[in-house]
């Protein structure tokens, strides 16, 4: 996976067997993270060249899947919409609606009748990472610095949460500063 537009994506495969993420006793190498991200990218694109800033939400606890999803959605040209696993069905409905989401990725244990009803009413499809189709990863990823990368919802202390869009360039700058 490579792109000329966001310098932090290529480092996933360049670091090889170095540890990328640690979760308690478990660790994930950059190679393993790159493989997981590639599965997300290929599955979401499913033969298309780009998600064209499609908003793709996910409802996963902090985990390796969460990391692969946030990177994979952006790498595929989409806008990642991470949602809180502690949000109520009503709060999730608001966020999904405001963000204009059409696909929600979540593990089976996060599904509920209330969330199923919300997704059905909004026309949002639900699937898990393992349900993404196996497909080829494109050689070049469709990224440009000015395109949307991430929608983060505010806390909503004075009203309903608002979605704040971050660009590929702003996310890249943040990640680069963390790496340095």
Positions of predicted regions on the chain:
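Conserved pre-ATP/AMP-binding loop-to-beta segment of ANL
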Residues: 17, 136-153, 160, 165
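AMP-dependent adenylate-forming
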Residues: 7-29
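Conserved AMP-binding/adenylate-forming
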Residues: 26, 41-90
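Conserved ATP-dependent adenylate/AMP-binding module captured primarily in the ANL superfamily
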Residues: 85-114, 174-180
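Flexible, low-complexity linker/hinge segments
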Residues: 1, 128-148, 175
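Conserved structural elements of the adenylate-forming
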Residues: 34-42, 164-180
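Residue-level detector of anion-binding/catalytic polar loops
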Residues: 79, 102, 125
């Amino acid at each position: 996976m490579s792109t000329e537009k966001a310098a932090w994506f290529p480092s996933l495969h360049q670091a090889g067997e170095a540890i990328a993420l640690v979760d308690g006793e478990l660790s994930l190498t950059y190679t393993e993270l790159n493989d997981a991200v590639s599965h997300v990218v290929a599955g979401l694109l499913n033969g298309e060249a780009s998600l064209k800033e499609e908003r793709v939400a996910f409802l996963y606890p902090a985990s390796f899947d969460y990391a692969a999803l946030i990177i994979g959605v952006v790498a595929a040209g989409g806008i990642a919409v991470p949602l809180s696993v502690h949000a109520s069905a009503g709060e999730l409905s608001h966020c999904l609606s405001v963000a204009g989401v059409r696909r929600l990725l979540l593990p089976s244990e996060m599904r509920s009748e209330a969330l199923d009803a919300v997704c059905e009413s909004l026309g949002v499809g639900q699937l898990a990472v393992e349900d993404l189709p196996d497909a080829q990863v494109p050689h070049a990823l469709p990224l440009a610095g000015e395109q949307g990368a991430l929608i983060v919802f505010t806390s909503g202390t004075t009203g309903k949460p608002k979605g704040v869009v971050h660009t590929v360039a702003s996310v890249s700058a943040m990640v680069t500063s963390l790496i340095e």
